[in-house]
């Protein structure tokens, strides 16, 4: 008899012993308590080199889901680019050189934009510094930087020291300037909130209500208003000539390597077919370079990604299982695009259900997000499928607010939903595995008691509903082989990691 299985991916829920600032440990979680006490479980590494990131680098949702589906460690953006820097290949990149030559030939400024922080989730400031050096050494005379405040993968108000470092570098070059500043809330939305994105886009064009002559002064002004890095209101530098802001035929480099929050802004610049929304102030450029491939965006790509040819979902489909992917908007791409290897796969006998995420400024005010609706939908249609991958976004998205009380509430709401799924699974003869893609909710305060809004390097859980098996510890790349093993299916030779189910000798 074919087994039926649900893989529940809890976004941003790591395991940490200390209780201070721990939204998981401080929450009332009778369901999780029972699962840990009575069911097979183990620890899963979800950060650093274990998931293809630099040593000590916190995990993230994209990398986590890629590794979960791949069955091997997937080296992604930051590792690929860092290696190019290490070997010197970065400074031979033909796509960058093409953009530089276009700037030199036309006399138009090189426009470089991206998330400015050492967070390493969507971008890294070291890559920007390297680009500036590369452009200068190649002979680019005029360069404009369009910086997006982070405040999420790093501290909420942490950008000033890095801006000061950047200013020191820019002093070496007469026409290299910070042309605009905006928060990632505007420039890196992924939830089709184009009213926000257009404000960030307009700042690239030199159109914004807010202005500055000194970036540090503007940051201080925003802080005085209670605005953190993530939410910086788009502003432009009055010292930059109006004609030097982004315009027709200007070369552009977008130094974000992670695609999901880069696609909407890229779409507005390039006017692709990816979304219906069109910019009110369109421009045209044929020289647009992305660090890595942004799915659906036709542009020059600086670095090729590692390919996942035979992900878990593809093998499940080939085995004749009817499968479902279920998540809310914030994590829908992760249970489809990313877990399928970073491509849009059309799998036989496979359905996708998207539950709309609440359109709010802060999930701290709505820690339930769409967890109840996701569970309701599973209970409504789940019995029609053999294999289900689903995601709960609460711990991650609420954890990003740094609000401990809200994070505790999010975890408690999630615990209740997991309880509903446990009951349903037993009634419908389903088994389940519960894991997470990375940590977050378990650390909402730093060592000084200030809010921590970033991911963590703590391990995550793997829990099985089947009391007849035993699990050993591993990493996210072990999960696909474990599921295939449990379902009695062979893993693909590409999957060089083993099942975590302990076999009797």
UniProtKB/Swiss-Prot annotation:
Cited CDD domains: iPGM
Active site: 61 (phosphoserine intermediate)
GO CC terms: cytosol
Entry cofactors: Mn(2+)
Pfam families given in the database record: iPGM_N, Metalloenzyme
Protein name, UniProt field: 2,3-bisphosphoglycerate-independent phosphoglycerate mutase
Cofactor details (free text): Binds 2 manganese ions per subunit.
Listed Gene3D superfamilies: Alkaline Phosphatase, subunit A, BPG-independent phosphoglycerate mutase, domain B
Organism from which the protein derives: Mesomycoplasma hyopneumoniae (strain J / ATCC 25934 / NCTC 10110)
Top-level class of the enzyme under EC nomenclature: isomerase
Catalysed reaction equations from the record: (2R)-2-phosphoglycerate = (2R)-3-phosphoglycerate
Entry similarity comment: Belongs to the BPG-independent phosphoglycerate mutase family.
Biological processes per GO annotation: glucose catabolic process; glycolytic process
Residues bound to Mn(2+) 1: 396, 400, 455
Alphabetical keyword list: Glycolysis, Isomerase, Manganese, Metal-binding
């Amino acid at each position: 008899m074919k087994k039926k299985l649900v893989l529940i991916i809890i976004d941003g829920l790591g395991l940490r012993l200390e209780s201070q600032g721990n939204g998981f440990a401080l929450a009332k979680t009778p369901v999780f308590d029972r699962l840990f006490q009575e069911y097979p479980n183990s620890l899963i590494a979800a950060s650093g080199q274990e998931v293809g990131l630099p040593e000590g680098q916190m995990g993230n949702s994209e990398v986590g889901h890629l590794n979960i589906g791949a069955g091997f460690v997937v080296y992604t953006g930051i590792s690929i680019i860092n290696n190019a820097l290490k070997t010197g290949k970065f400074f031979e990149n033909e796509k960058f050189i093409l953009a530089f030559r276009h700037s030199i030939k036309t006399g138009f400024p090189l426009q470089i934009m991206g998330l400015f922080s050492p967070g390493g989730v969507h971008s890294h400031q070291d890559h920007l510094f390297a680009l500036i050096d590369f452009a200068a050494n190649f002979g680019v005379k005029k360069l404009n930087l369009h910086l997006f405040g982070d405040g999420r993968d790093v501290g909420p108000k942490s950008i000033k020291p890095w801006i000061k470092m950047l200013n020191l570098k820019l002093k070496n070059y007469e026409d290299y300037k910070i042309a605009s500043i905006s928060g990632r809330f505007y420039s890196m939305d992924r939830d089709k909130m184009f009213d926000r994105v257009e404000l960030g886009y307009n700042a690239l064009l030199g159109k914004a209500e807010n202005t500055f002559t000194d970036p540090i002064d503007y940051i201080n002004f925003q802080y005085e208003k209670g605005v953190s890095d993530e939410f910086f209101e788009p502003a432009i530098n009055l010292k930059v000539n109006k004609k030097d802001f982004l315009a027709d035929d200007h070369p552009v480099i977008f130094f974000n390597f992670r695609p999901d929050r880069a696609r909407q802004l890229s779409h507005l610049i390039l006017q692709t077919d990816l979304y219906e929304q069109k910019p009110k102030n369109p421009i045209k450029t044929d020289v647009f370079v992305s660090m890595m491939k942004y799915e659906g965006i036709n542009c020059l790509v600086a670095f090729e990604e590692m390919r996942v040819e035979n992900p878990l979902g593809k093998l499940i489909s080939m085995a004749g299982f009817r499968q479902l992917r279920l998540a809310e908007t914030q994590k829908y791409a992760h249970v489809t695009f990313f877990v399928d290897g970073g491509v849009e796969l059309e799998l036989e006998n496979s359905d996708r259900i998207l539950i709309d995420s609440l359109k709010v400024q802060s999930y701290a005010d709505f820690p339930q997000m769409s967890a109840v609706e996701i569970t309701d939908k599973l209970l409504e249609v789940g019995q029609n499928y053999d294999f289900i991958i689903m995601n709960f976004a609460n711990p991650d998205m609420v954890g990003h607010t740094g609000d401990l009380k809200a994070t505790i509430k999010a975890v408690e709401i999630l615990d209740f939903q997991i309880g509903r799924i446990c009951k349903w699974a037993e009634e419908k003869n389903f088994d389940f595995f519960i894991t997470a893609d990375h940590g977050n909710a378990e650390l909402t305060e730093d060592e000084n008691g200030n809010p921590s809004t970033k991911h963590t390097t703590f391990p995550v859980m793997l829990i099985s509903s089947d009391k007849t098996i035993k699990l050993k510890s591993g990493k996210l790349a072990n999960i696909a082989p474990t599921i295939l093993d449990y379902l009695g299916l062979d893993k693909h030779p590409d999957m060089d990691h083993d099942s975590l189910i302990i076999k009797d000798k």
